């Protein structure tokens, strides 16, 4: 977008984090055509740099015309188009107490009827509409703000730098090249030799492989950003609560020798190897006539469905028996699962059936023997062993549009296979390109844009 989009109103909001109510500095951001004039009305300054673009100067916030000052501030002016939003932007750097920053904001809003509180994400939305950033960069800004670990923050910054757009544009350019040739053949059929379907299918296969790789990595991206939810499942008294306490490094669940001690779900959020994990301790599964315990067991099966990963724990003392097999059969086949044999300190591992050892981690939770192997197994099965090779974060919206594009390309294969009219290839390729354009924000409705930016914080 070359032109700068402006609106009649000017927006303002607290742009810094002040959730605890205290801080050294708080920033009020103002954007719009009245940003500078509105701030001039409430700021007294003698600085020779006052109101110059990209200059910081000192001033005082004036509450009324009687020169009553309420705060000493630093003011940063960024004039259109050289600002984040593309509009005139002023930042007021106040002292960080919640009382004073709210007071300054209130004075600012009362200075001009065309200044209002910004909607969530409205600064970023204006930056997008003015062509300062694409939609993936805007979403990456929000991801960076909400990052829960360093790797998630790194992926978010990669998106801010435009890495997502680069990958999408690369795929889109491949499809545009194919589309240009096909449309030229449709319009000037007599000027071309026969169409090389084999070459076309080969080129499209390469494009599909790029898309499939992005979609495949998207789940791993989600684990890095949102975390892995891990349900501890098994019969009573096999060590589920002990494992929760071991991973949490503190006692979160009551541990006794009495079967059925855990009757409700206990959840603990941890960060292990810089990956957020939610460990869910569930009630032991067994036949029972006790009503409260039965409710807990029902919740256990509910958590199996909700979780990304299942650790099924059984006692090596008792062995892996028919009851264990029956419970595992209830776990959906698509679920990632690791079987953990606990209490290895109480038995001679040489006497364990070799079939039982297959795909099983042997552990002594009591003696903390096997924790590293368990963590490594979780990370490997979730595809995070080579986490450094994942350099972008694709959210659910991106994945949906990539899948739609992949569906379009699969349809072109069917068109060729069934010898359907040649111009249908053009239609599917155009739809595929359009689905890719939606990712970067070139093909979106105003309603959908509003929905995306509404999930941002107000000051961004």
UniProtKB/Swiss-Prot annotation:
Residue positions binding Mg(2+): 241, 262
Binding annotation for GTP: 237-242, 256-262, 281-284
Cofactor descriptive note: Binds 1 potassium ion per subunit.
Residues where K(+) binds: 237, 256, 258, 261
UniProt GO molecular function: GTP binding; GTPase activity; metal ion binding
GO aspect biological process, one term: tRNA methylation
Keyword Disulfide bond applies: no
Binding positions for (6S)-5-formyl-5,6,7,8-tetrahydrofolate per the UniProt entry: 29, 91, 132, 460
GO cellular component: cytosol
Keywords, in A-Z order: Cytoplasm, GTP-binding, Hydrolase, Magnesium, Metal-binding, Nucleotide-binding, Potassium, tRNA processing
Residue span, TrmE-type G domain: 227-383
InterPro entries from the UniProt entry: G_TrmE (IPR031168), GTP-bd (IPR006073), GTP-bd_TrmE_N (IPR018948), GTPase_MnmE (IPR004520), MnmE_dom2 (IPR027368), MnmE_helical (IPR025867), P-loop_NTPase (IPR027417), Small_GTP-bd (IPR005225)
Cofactor(s) required for function per UniProt: K(+)
Location in the cell: Cytoplasm
Enzyme Commission code(s) on record: 3.6.-.-
Source organism, top-level taxon: Bacteria
Subunit structure: Homodimer. Heterotetramer of two MnmE and two MnmG subunits.
Family under the similarity heading: Belongs to the TRAFAC class TrmE-Era-EngA-EngB-Septin-like GTPase superfamily. TrmE GTPase family.
Job of this protein: Exhibits a very high intrinsic GTPase hydrolysis rate. Involved in the addition of a carboxymethylaminomethyl (cmnm) group at the wobble position (U34) of certain tRNAs, forming tRNA-cmnm(5)s(2)U34.
Protein name per the record: tRNA modification GTPase MnmE
Source species: Prochlorococcus marinus (strain MIT 9301)
């Amino acid at each position: 977008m070359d032109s700068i989009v402006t609106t009649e109103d000017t927006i303002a909001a607290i742009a810094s984090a002040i959730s605890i109510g205290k801080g050294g500095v708080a920033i009020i951001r103002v954007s719009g055509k009245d940003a500078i004039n509105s701030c001039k009305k409430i700021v007294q300054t003698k600085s020779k740099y006052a109101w110059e673009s990209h200059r910081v100067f000192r001033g005082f916030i004036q509450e009324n015309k009687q020169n009553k000052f309420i705060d000493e501030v630093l003011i940063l002016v960024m004039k259109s188009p050289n600002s984040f939003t593309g509009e005139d932007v002023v930042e007021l750097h106040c002292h960080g107490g919640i009382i004073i920053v709210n007071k300054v904001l209130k004075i600012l809003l009362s200075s001009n009827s065309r200044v209002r509180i910004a909607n969530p994400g409205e600064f970023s939305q204006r930056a997008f509409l003015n062509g300062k950033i694409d939609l993936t960069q805007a979403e990456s800004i929000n991801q960076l703000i909400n990052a829960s670990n360093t790797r998630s923050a790194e992926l978010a910054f990669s998106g801010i730098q435009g890495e997502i757009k680069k990958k999408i544009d690369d795929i889109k350019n491949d499809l545009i090249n194919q589309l240009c040739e096909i449309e030229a053949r449709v319009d000037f059929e007599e000027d071309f030799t026969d169409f090389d379907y084999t070459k076309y299918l080969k080129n499209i296969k390469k494009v599909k492989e790029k898309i499939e790789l992005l979609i495949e990595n998207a789940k791993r991206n989600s684990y890095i950003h949102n975390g892995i939810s891990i349900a501890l499942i098994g019969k009573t008294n096999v060590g589920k609560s002990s494992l929760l306490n071991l991973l949490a490094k503190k006692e979160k669940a009551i541990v006794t020798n009495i079967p059925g001690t855990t009757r409700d779900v206990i959840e603990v959020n941890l960060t292990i190897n810089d990956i957020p994990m939610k460990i869910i301790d569930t009630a032991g599964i067994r036949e029972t006539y006790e009503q409260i315990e039965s409710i807990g067991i029902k919740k256990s099966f509910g958590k199996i469905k909700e979780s990304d990963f299942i650790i099924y724990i059984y006692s090596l003392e008792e062995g892996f028996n028919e009851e264990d097999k029956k419970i595992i059969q209830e776990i959906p086949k698509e679920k990632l699962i690791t079987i953990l044999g606990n209490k290895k300190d109480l038995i001679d591992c040489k006497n364990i059936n070799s079939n039982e050892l297959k795909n099983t981690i042997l552990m002594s939770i009591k003696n903390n023997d096997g924790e590293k192997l368990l963590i490594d197994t979780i990370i490997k099965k979730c595809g995070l062993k080579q986490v450094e090779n994942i350099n972008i974060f694709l959210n659910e919206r991106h994945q949906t549009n990539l899948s739609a594009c992949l569906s379009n390309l699969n349809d072109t294969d069917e068109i060729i296979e069934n010898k359907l009219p040649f111009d249908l290839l053009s239609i599917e390729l155009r739809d595929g390109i359009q689905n890719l354009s939606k990712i970067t924000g070139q093909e979106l409705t105003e309603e959908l844009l509003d929905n995306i930016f509404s999930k941002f914080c107000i000051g961004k």
